[in-house]
């Protein structure tokens, strides 16, 4: 198995685990990147990008990163907050008056970021391809009735998060979510990362290999149960196979359609690990990063995912569910002030401010879970161990 790229000798453990993912854990094509104090110390890739065409995973290969996109979308909202243009504690209707229908008038922007708004799905089935029609999706969300009283429960907004937060970004900035992200994050940082992929980049996109669903897991059982919030998740005009298509890549789905690689995802988080700036590019300030790091919502049972979750205004926090019963063990083991987001099947990106480290892993063979699996976690573990950290079964990294 050939691994390409570069790795600082101090982080050789990451390179070793990356190779083991291919040799022992079924990896097909992937990339991993780590930055320390804004400098890249790991930038590796390898494997096959498209098993049907037998194309190699190249240096510039990119792939859909599913819910890692939520981190990019949340960052856009935080940028507007840092600039004084968006009050995260304000009601959504301050910026989006039409949203205040059907019992949603008191929902705040903070509730959207915390997955507490109760608009975790759309009950009415939408026509195929609706996910690519922003106005249609926004109108459907304006009409939707909350599944629970807003602010009283935490329930992961698997797809609706992107349109809800993205529309706030659009109303405040005057730009679409994808354009705002390009103008304020991707282009200033010089990264290959799109929410709404240009057609000329399409040949570089790796083809995802979907995992068999965990049919015995409680979350998947609920998908098959009529009239549950889980059963309505894909009432957005497309299933996962359609999201990983040209039309899905082109759509600005702020919860799921981001296209990048580990290099781009890690570099997006690099300034967030370093006080808000990378070189001459200032993204946010230290106070904003503290808000990103602080746990703002947590629950013993997420109303949608049915597992314990912890969030920090749009970002996932470290959560150790490994001792939970079978089917409830979705986990991400990070340092305590780290924040980021995992993507369905195993991709992940995060910032660890104490360590001044950013990390990202992307791949095309999806695992069955909705957070990281043994491939991603082994790389995360190796990065922390390279910095001299140790972990115990409590999931706490110590040095």
Kindly label every feature range from the protein language model.
Residues 3-66, 87:
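Short, conserved catalytic-motif segment at the N-terminal edge
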Residues 208-262, 290-354, 390-399:
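Active-site Gly/Thr loop motif
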Residues 61-62, 121-204, 242-260:
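Catalytic-site signature segments of enzymes, centered on catalytic residues
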Residues 50-60, 368-380:
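A short, polar/charged loop-to-alpha-helix boundary motif
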Residues 59, 64-68, 82-124, 142-143, ...:
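Active-site helix/loop module of the DD-peptidase/beta-lactamase fold
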Residues 115, 161-168, 252, 256-278, ...:
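Active-site-proximal alpha-helical segments within enzyme catalytic domains
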Residues 10-14, 65-69, 73, 109, ...:
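Hydrophobic (often cysteine-bearing) scaffold residues that line and stabilize catalytic clefts
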Residues 12, 18-19, 38, 62-89, ...:
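Active-site SXXK
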């Amino acid at each position: 198995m050939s691994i390409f790229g570069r790795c600082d000798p101090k982080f050789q453990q990451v390179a070793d685990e990356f190779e083991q993912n291919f040799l022992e854990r079924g990896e097909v094509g992937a990339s991993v990147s780590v930055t320390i104090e804004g400098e890249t110390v790991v930038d590796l890739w390898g494997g096959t990008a498209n098993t049907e065409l037998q194309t190699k995973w190249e240096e510039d290969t990119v792939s859909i990163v599913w819910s890692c996109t939520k981190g990019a979308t949340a960052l856009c909202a935080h940028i507007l907050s840092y600039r004084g243009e968006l009050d995260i504690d304000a009601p959504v209707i301050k910026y989006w008056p039409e949203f205040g229908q059907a019992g949603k008038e008191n929902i705040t922007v903070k509730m959207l970021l915390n997955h507490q708004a109760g608009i975790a799905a759309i009950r009415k089935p939408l026509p195929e391809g609706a996910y690519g029609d922003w106005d249609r999706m926004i109108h459907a969300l304006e009409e939707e009735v909350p599944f629970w009283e807003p602010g009283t429960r935490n329930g992961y907004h698997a797809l609706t998060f992107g349109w809800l937060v993205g529309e706030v970004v659009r109303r405040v900035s005057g730009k679409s979510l994808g354009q705002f992200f390009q103008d304020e994050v991707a282009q200033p940082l010089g990264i290959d990362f799109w929410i709404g992929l240009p057609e000329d980049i399409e040949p570089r996109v790796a083809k995802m290999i979907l995992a068999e669903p965990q049919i015995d897991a409680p979350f998947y059982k609920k998908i098959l149960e009529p009239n549950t919030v889980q059963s309505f998740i894909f009432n957005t005009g497309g299933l996962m196979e359609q999201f990983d298509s040209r039309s899905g890549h082109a759509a600005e789905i702020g919860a799921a359609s981001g296209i990048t690689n580990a290099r781009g995802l890690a570099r997006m988080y690099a300034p967030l690990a370093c006080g808000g700036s990378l070189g001459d590019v200032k993204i946010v300030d230290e106070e904003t990063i503290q808000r990103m790091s602080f746990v703002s919502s947590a629950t013993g049972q997420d109303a949608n995912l049915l597992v314990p979750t912890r969030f920090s205004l749009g970002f996932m926090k470290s959560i150790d569910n490994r001792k939970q019963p079978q089917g409830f063990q979705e986990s991400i083991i990070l340092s305590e002030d780290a924040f980021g987001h995992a993507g369905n099947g195993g991709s992940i990106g995060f910032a660890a401010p104490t360590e001044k480290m950013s990390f990202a892993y992307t791949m095309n063979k999806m695992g069955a879970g909705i957070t990281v699996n043994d491939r991603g976690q082994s790389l995360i573990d190796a990065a922390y161990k390279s910095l001299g950290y140790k972990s115990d079964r409590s999931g706490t990294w110590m040095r």
